Swiss-Prot record:
It holds the Pfam family CbiA. SUPFAM superfamilies: Class I glutamine amidotransferase-like, P-loop containing nucleoside triphosphate hydrolases. Residues 251-443 form the GATase cobBQ-type domain. It comes from Listeria monocytogenes serotype 4b (strain F2365). This is Cobyric acid synthase. The active site is at C332, H435. Keywords: Cobalamin biosynthesis, Glutamine amidotransferase.
Amino acid sequence: MVKQIMIQGTASDAGKSVLVAGLCRLFKNKGKRVVPFKSQNMSLNSFITATGDEMGRAQVFQAEAAGVFPDVRMNPVLLKPTNDRQSQVIFMGAILDNMDAVTYHDFKQTLIPKIQAVYQSLADENDIIVLEGAGSPAEINLNDRDIVNMGMAKMVDAPVVLVADIDKGGVFASIYGTIMLLNEEERARIKGVIINKFRGDVALLQPGIDMIEELTNVPVIGVIPYANLQLEEEDSVSLSGKNYVPDSNALLDIAIICLPRISNFTDFHSLEIQPEISLRYIRNLADFGKPDLVIIPGSKNTLEDMAFLEESGLKKAIQNFAENAGKVIGICGGYQMLGKKMLDPNQVESKQLEIAGLGLLDTETIFLDQKRTTQITGVTHSGEAVEGYEIHMGETKRGESTSPFCEIKAVNGNEETHQDGAISVNKNIIGTYIHGIFDNDVFLGNLFDELLTRKNKSVYPHEIINLKEHKEQEYDKLAALLEANIQMDQLEKIMKGEKICVSTQKPAIKE
C-alpha cells in the first residue's frame, strides 16, 4: 500500500514546492518509487510533457528530483490566470475553458472523482506520494469546496505537515493562526510542523518552539536552515525579490522585462546560474539602464502586456535600444510583441481586437482558439542543435525582411519539419516560440561570445554550467539538508499513520 505525506504551508512561498522536491529526492535516494502530486496548481509557469500535455513547472522539477519523467497525472488541474478575474482551466494537460473565480468555484466539485481516479493510478504504481498544497489551508472563504489543501488530504486520507517561513517574520503567529482557523477535523490532520528558512542559533528559537507546541499540541519536527540553493522558483511571489540593479562587476548585463502577466520565467534559470552574468528584471523605465541584452519573456495576456509596455514607456526604450544596435530576444509572447501587430478577432486573450507591436520584426500574429503544446528539437539559423517546448495560441507569419530562427526537426519525438521564429536583417532581433532555448549549452555559450565581442572583449571565459547536471547536484544538496534537519523517524511514523506526540527531543539545526 502506498505511503503518503502532504506538505501544506502557512502562505504562498513558504517553501512547499522545494520541500516536496527535497523529500522526493531523499526517498528516491533510499531506493523508493516516489512521485510528487499537486491536484491543482495556479501558475503561469508550465511545461509540455513528451506526450504534449501541459502541466505546472513545480511538479516537473519535483519529478526530476524523484528521478522520474514528468507525468501530467502529477498535476491534473492547472489554472493559468489570463487577467485578475479569469483563468484558463486545464485538466490532464488539455484546455477545458476560461472561467471566472465564481464559475470555477462551482465547477471544481465535478473534478473530484476525476482527481481521485488520477491519484489512485499513481498510488498503484509507486511506494510513496508526496503531495503539495497551495497557498494556505486557512483560506476560510474557499474551504467549503477546496480540492487542493485539506479537501485533497481528506479525499485520500493523507496526513499533513505544515511548513512555515520564518525568514519573513511572524512565524509563530502564522503557525498558530493557520491551525486555529481550521475546523476540528482539519486540525487533526496536521501531524507536524516544519519551520523553514531559519538563520542563526536554533537555541534562540527553542522557547518559541516549546510554546507553539503547547498551544497547538502539534510537534515541530524540523527547523530547516536558510540555504542558498539554486533551484527553480515557481511562485510568481518570488519575482518580487528578483534583482533589478545591474552588477557592475559582471561581464554581461542581461535585462528581462518583468511583464505583469509574465509566464515561464523559469526559462531564465540557466542564465541565473552562469558565472559573471548579471541577470535583472526591469519593472519600469527607471530600471532600464544600459543592458547588453534585453529579453522579452512569455506572457499569458500578450495584448495587455503590450499595452503595459506602451503605457510604462518601456516600448519606446526597447525601440531606442534596438535602433542603437542593441540585441533583443523575444520568447513566445515576447516574440509576438516584437512584430508589427497582434490580432485577436475571437478575443482569445483579451477584449482588444488588435494592438500594435514593437515593430522590430516584420511579423504579424493572430490568436487562435487552439493551443499548440509540443516538445521540439531543431537546429538554429547558426547551426546549433537545440531542444525545448512550445506553448502558445498565436500563429505568427513572417514578412520578406525576416528569416527563420530555427528549423524544427522533430515534434513530440516524431519527425516533423517546420520553421520557428524570426530574425531581423541585422541579426540583432530574434523571436522564437521555443521555451527552454537558453538551456542549450552551445547556443548559450555562442550568445555570450557574441555579446562580449560587441563590447570588444574576448569570448566568455567560463564553461557553460549545464542546467540538468547543476540541478541534480542541487537536488542532492537539498535532500541532505532535509535529512539532517528533519526528525525523519517522526516523519516516517506520520506516514505510517502512527501517532506522534510533542516530545522533549528538540531539533538541532545542521548546515
